[in-house]
């Protein structure tokens, strides 16, 4: 073995085959920050690789379709061009594809694709967003193309998002420049759509059903059909659908009254249908890609998800999960690190929550449509006569007979009553299981036995999950008053209401106890200040 010795003062370092001690001992271990940066780099490279492959496959697929169409025009019928019917079908498909796209310009350079997606998502499901990037500055060029699943979503976005303030700039929203060649077909589709009294409804709450939407909208007239588009995989609706009325006036009233109406915490987007009725189909593969590309994308996504899970478990408690994380996880990151989620439809006329990396940028949207709906026809409430059991007739007079749940489920409601019932349905899903007891004890009365005593007493009304005794100082002064609030969480809401009914107003140690329902969301977020 060849060796060499380098003398440095009194010390010497022996080299073997040109390798020093550092090579023999190995590199020092990576710090947590370096490990995080490495994981980010790996995941970013994987994401870019997948995006590049999908773009190439999409382009190849589109070119293949164009080639097939051209070949069909030459070969079909021994050299004859496509038949008029086939040619018209192809033209309509191209026109529909163009109608689904909108151009978005004057985008602030700090805003990314996620911000654009979340700002435009309330109008309908987005198939793709195409942003052009400058390879030198590594920033987008200030414009993008948003492609929706249905033309009506693009039409609503065009009507309601043009000149909206986004990131400190008034964005420009319009049709793509190539719409001119398809304009005659688009006009023809619009003319056909006028023969049907259809409206498009988007931003529908996930917990609402077709019947719920129908009951709300039938206040404006008789409905022929009401269908929400379904995801064939999950079976859940995708947040949009179409309603067809018998009369044109009904559809006009519904659009003018229900656009931007708050239904279940989400503001509906309602507009006239711009295409004739077609089946609410979902492409079998995302974005119309060939099956191989869809499978590859799904596999790659699963791989990335697995990497995130492994990386998150390795650095739990010390590091935030790198890369694409859920909005809840981004709360752990420093302010300004990533854009926050955009709730584009939190209030009529306002888009809130858009926070680019720097600086903080307000996002506002001018008021559109009617915020407080004016009913075109007075709401009606008709109850179907329930079947009465013999025992009920004997026990209760007709005026005092209780309504059974099965009877309530068959009520026929419409108009404002329908909207109220739908809102109540959504609120029931969030009923609180937490009771707060006020004015029960003084701070000096708190001891180790108090929690057990409260648990035992409240256990008479149901299963108690936990008891929290909270002392709240009423000011910054040293001698500020301290009040005691006792929070009791039951297993179900009915037990909470039973306890409140029994304990509210009861006297305890010379004090009149106040028992109330406490907001579940506040309690879950450890906010005991209300």
From Swiss-Prot:
Where composition is biased (Basic and acidic residues), the residues are: 398-408
According to the UniProt record, list the residues that bear Phosphothreonine. 31, 285
Region listing for Disordered, in residue ranges:
387-408
**Keyword terms of this UniProt record:** Acetylation, Apoptosis, DNA-binding, Isopeptide bond, mRNA processing, mRNA splicing, Nucleus, Phosphoprotein, Repeat, Repressor, Ribonucleoprotein, RNA-binding, Transcription, Transcription regulation, Ubl conjugation
- Carrying Phosphoserine, the residues are 83, 215
| CDD domains given in the database record | RRM1_PUF60, RRM2_PUF60, RRM3_UHM_PUF60
Tell me which InterPro entries the record gives: Nucleotide-bd_a/b_plait_sf, PUF60-like, PUF60_regulator, PUF60_RRM1, PUF60_RRM2, PUF60_RRM3, RBD_domain_sf, RRM_dom
Q: Under what name is this protein listed? A: Poly(U)-binding-splicing factor PUF60
Organism this protein belongs to: Bos taurus (Bovine)
Q: Which gene encodes it?
A: PUF60
